[in-house]
């Protein structure tokens, strides 16, 4: 017993000695080298593995104001050349203004499809109605002869949820003609959508425009719930409806509804993340205290305390002042949007956003991309459960003039989150897309998780592996042990939001910091229906620096779910093995000396 304890102490000491230090990284503009420079692509709108090669691809929207055509183009990642290339997967619509594209497997055949929302420019007041078409993918193209249109016009862009827990994405929105809230389910028998009215015991308010509703677990039971962004027309206040999945049925009540922060005059798009890494999801909201956004703040709503807390304010900035931009530009892109990703890989989710920056010695402001590093804090007005944001203005973003979008994406599939940005030329009404590589110099660990759909495994139509289904809502949580013996927990939801250029990648990347230990537990939870059991499963002893693909088939038998582990070797793994080997040699020598 004493020898075992000595072995454990020595091993942990060697690991601490080897891996002590801070995370060092730099950013590099790689727009040209990945094939995105010099092309009039329109705006980056979504990610998805369209050709099912386990490499995520890019979806672009381009609206031509001259000929009235709207296009969606898919650029595929070429692993041999390390660049994105044009494909034959193209959607073209006449006399429309495309507002969004949402990749997903809408007919559950294992192929990635595309939901396209648009305004019909032939109609008077065309911006008051949003139309939806779903284009079904097959191999590396869209089946243009098998297009299904939503029979009803919506008031705004739809949200994607799994309302009935059948693991097939449903469409949620307010119908334009009567203003009521419905959800639409796809029927493969007649290739059509049928609607059902959303009913509740409480008064249902209209969804806000723009809306930022989400499909994710907020109750802590690993089953996805819904958080819907609504607006009270009489008070002009934003309210958030929380719909909890109880025995396979999504329900809400008055206690599950909360309002915007009292001090807020302007409300931005909601974002959700486990900010303090406690395994529970937090609601993150950019707000302006005044109508001009001269005082801007980021608030966090805790599901445990049911209160808003401030995590960042633009007061007391050193040498400059930042402020949110409340305008919506171009294709209807809300600028008050925060996108989440652990870019420094320390185990705490960071953020990126577009803001106006005014230097103290200048009168005019300049729009810039900024990064928000999630750092430790002891106390203070902007300290939320021991965490706060520290703003980072990197010079690499100087090439991104007049930015409108910024988000995180693993370009090179190496487990490190890079940065994608879009800038807008208002005079020419054209977009430029930018790729920024995130180079981590210190040996940090990661865990990349992709959860597939549960409709098929080896028997998918056409024999395809369902790697590109963009399953919305799976909840993922890990538990591991840090260098100091402390328990580390974090959680995230795959593709929790889709409307208004949410730009979420079709996977989850957890930074593990400089912790080379095995991930002790990985828990994955899926939506539940009324007739299904609880759908969650736990995997143990996951190797760090690996990508794990979860195949939840059959969905109602979690014990039979499969996992595919792809390891990304690094110096960290070798050093971990070296520490273990050195410990074993030391113990062997000690035993030998004592024996002789």
Locate the predicted segments by residue:
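Cleavable N-terminal signal peptides of Sec/SRP-targeted secreted and luminal proteins
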Residues: 6-25
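Acidic/hydrophobic-patterned starts of short beta strands in beta-sheet-rich repeat architectures
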Residues: 52-63, 108-118, 165-174, 220-229, ...
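Repeat-based blade/solenoid architectures
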Residues: 33-46, 90-102, 147-159, 201-214, ...
């Amino acid at each position: 017993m004493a020898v075992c304890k000595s072995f454990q102490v020595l091993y942990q000491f060697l690991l601490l000695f080897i891996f002590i230090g801070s995370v060092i990284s730099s950013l590099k503009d790689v727009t040209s080298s990945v094939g995105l420079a010099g092309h009039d692509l329109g705006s980056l709108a979504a990610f998805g593995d369209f050709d099912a090669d386990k490499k995520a691809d890019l979806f672009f929207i381009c609206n031509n104001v001259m000929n009235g055509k709207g296009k969606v183009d898919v650029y595929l990642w070429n692993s041999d050349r390390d660049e994105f290339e044009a494909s034959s997967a193209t959607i073209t619509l006449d006399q429309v203004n495309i507002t969004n594209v949402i990749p997903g497997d809408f007919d559950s055949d294992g192929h990635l499809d595309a939901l396209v929302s648009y305004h019909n420019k032939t109609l008077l007041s065309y911006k008051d109605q949003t139309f939806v078409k779903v284009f079904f993918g097959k191999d590396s193209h869209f089946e243009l002869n098998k297009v299904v249109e939503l029979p009803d016009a919506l008031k705004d862009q739809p949200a994607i949820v799994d309302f009935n827990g059948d693991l097939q994405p449903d469409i949620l929105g307010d119908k334009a003609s009567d203003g009521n809230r419905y959800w639409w389910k796809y029927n493969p028998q007649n290739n059509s959508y049928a609607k059902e009215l959303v009913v509740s015991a409480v008064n249902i308010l209209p969804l806000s425009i723009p809306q930022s509703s989400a499909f994710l677990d907020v109750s802590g039971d690993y089953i996805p719930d819904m958080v819907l962004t609504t607006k009270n027309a009489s008070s002009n206040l934003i309210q958030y409806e929380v719909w909890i999945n109880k025995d396979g049925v999504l329900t809400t009540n008055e206690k599950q509804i909360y309002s915007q922060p009292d001090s807020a005059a302007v409300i931005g798009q909601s974002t959700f993340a486990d900010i303090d890494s406690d395994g529970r999801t937090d609601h993150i909201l950019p707000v302006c205290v005044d109508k001009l956004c001269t005082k801007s703040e980021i608030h966090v709503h805790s599901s445990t305390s049911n209160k808003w807390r401030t995590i960042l304010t633009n007061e007391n900035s050193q040498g400059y002042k930042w402020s949110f931009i409340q305008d919506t530009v171009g294709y209807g892109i809300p600028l008050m949007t925060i996108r989440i990703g652990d870019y420094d890989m320390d185990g705490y989710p960071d953020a990126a956003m577009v803001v106006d920056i005014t230097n103290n010695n200048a009168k005019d402001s300049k729009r810039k991309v900024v990064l928000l590093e999630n750092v430790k804090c002891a106390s203070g007005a902007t300290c939320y459960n021991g965490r706060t944001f520290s703003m980072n203005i990197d010079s690499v973003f100087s090439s991104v003039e007049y930015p409108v979008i910024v988000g995180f994406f693993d370009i090179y599939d190496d487990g490190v989150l890079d940065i994608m940005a879009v800038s807008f030329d208002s005079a020419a009404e054209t977009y430029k897309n930018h790729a920024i590589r995130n180079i981590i110099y210190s040996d940090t660990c990661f865990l990349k998780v992709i959860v597939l759909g549960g409709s098929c495994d080896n028997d998918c139509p056409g024999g395809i592996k369902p790697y590109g289904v963009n399953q919305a809502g799976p909840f993922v949580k890990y538990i591991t042990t840090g260098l100091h013996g402390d328990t580390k927990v974090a959680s995230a939801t795959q593709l929790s939001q889709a409307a208004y250029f949410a730009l979420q990648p079709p996977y989850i990347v957890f930074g593990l910091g400089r912790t080379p230990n095995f991930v002790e537990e990985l828990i994955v939870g899926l939506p539940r229906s009324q007739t299904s059991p609880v759908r969650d499963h736990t995997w143990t002893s996951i190797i760090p620096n690996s990508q794990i693909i979860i195949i939840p088939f059959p969905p109602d038998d979690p014990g039979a779910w499969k996992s595919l582990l792809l390891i990304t070797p690094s110096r960290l793994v070798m050093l971990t093995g070296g520490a273990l080997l050195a410990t074993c040699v030391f113990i062997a020598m000690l035993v030998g000396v004592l024996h002789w």
